Amino acid sequence: MENLYVKLAAYREVETERLHLRPVTLEDAPAMFEYASDETVTRYTFPTNHSLEETRNNIALFYLASPLGRWGIELKENGKFIGTIDLLNLDLCLKKGSIGYVLNKDYWNQGLATEATKAVIALAFEQLGMNKLIAVHDQNNPASGRVMAKSGMKYSHEEPYAMLDLHEEGRMVTRVHYVLTKEEYLAEK
């Protein structure tokens, strides 16, 4: 039986109505830096990038070194690179993993993160044969939770003292967990 990574190799690109999910390249660095250097965007995701070189290094480290299950989000209408979505932490035995995403704030509140998330969820359950997907967000970032809910994921629980905040020294993060099983997905389809 093929493992998830072999199956993922066949899905380097995914199309939705408005989006083209595709591999991230070094040429995407300026567009990624546009949002990766914005503290409003990175507040609940990753350390803010301080130079284009840092963004290029991150692309090489995270997207070029391990490209499977990682997509750049590009607008079909104009080819603009606006964010990323990842299928991470794959458990090959249990066939489960997690979804993470980040979007340039100029494209927030347009349903684009939800559209990309729904596409990755469909791929995970319909093509890859996964059993369960998990997504988490900082309690102080409810907009991310709305993306998860609109994508069909179900609230699971809150995890107090989950980690230290990357941006606010001393603040302990409560993470909110959302889950979707294959059975739940198929029942709602």
Protein language model features and the residues they cover:
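Acyl-donor (CoA/ACP) binding surface of acyl/acetyltransferases
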Residues: 1-39, 43, 70, 74-189
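Juxtamembrane/interface motifs at transmembrane-helix termini
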Residues: 51-54, 63-65, 76, 102-104
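A short helix-loop-beta-strand connector motif used in the catalytic cores of GNAT acetyltransferases and
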Residues: 60-72
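Conserved GNAT-fold acetyl-CoA-binding loop/helix
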Residues: 40-61
